[in-house]
Amino acid sequence: MPTEIERQHLASQPRFNSYGPRELCGFGPVAAAARTSSQIAIHKPDRVLLIGIAGTFNASVLPVGGAALLPRVIMHGIGVGTDETFVPAGEMGFQHWRGEGEESAIGDEIVLSTPRSSISGSLLTCSAASASTQDMRHRLDRYPEVVAEDMEG
């Protein structure tokens, strides 16, 4: 969970405290990656879930207040340019991590290991959330398959 707000909300849900550690990962992609990495090293879990708040891009597929298990995360904002001039790193031929030994390369998109997906579509992770319909349109033009955006994916 990114923040204490999400943890407090979820703590009131049935069976929330029934499964393993429930750690905070922090706010934003960098903090979430660093904190998640340190917690995985400590707890050595078989599975990790990111549970938090995301903004929906399609309320008919993912209603406000709904929950979803998504099969993919796409990173937006790593590349060149902004808005309609933005070009993702992958389109320029760059990986975020080239991979090493048994480790897979990491690009603009990560396919998640999920038992099943509750809806089709991807989660878009951004350093700054959409502030307007225009922001959302720019992102949907580039990533038409996304149904929601967060800042920790």
Specify the residue positions occupied by each region the protein language model found:
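N-terminal short beta-loop-beta anion/metal-coordinating cradle
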Residues: M1-K44, V61
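Short pre-catalytic strand/loop immediately N-terminal to key active-site residues, enriched for Gly-Thr
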Residues: Y19-C25, R142-E149
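Short His-Asn-centered micro-motif
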Residues: C25-G26, I51, L70, S127, ...
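Conserved glycosyltransferase catalytic-site signature
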Residues: A33, D150-G153
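Structural motif
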Residues: R47-L49
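Mid-sequence, gly/pro-rich, charge-dense loop/helix-turn segments that line enzyme active sites
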Residues: N58-P144, A148
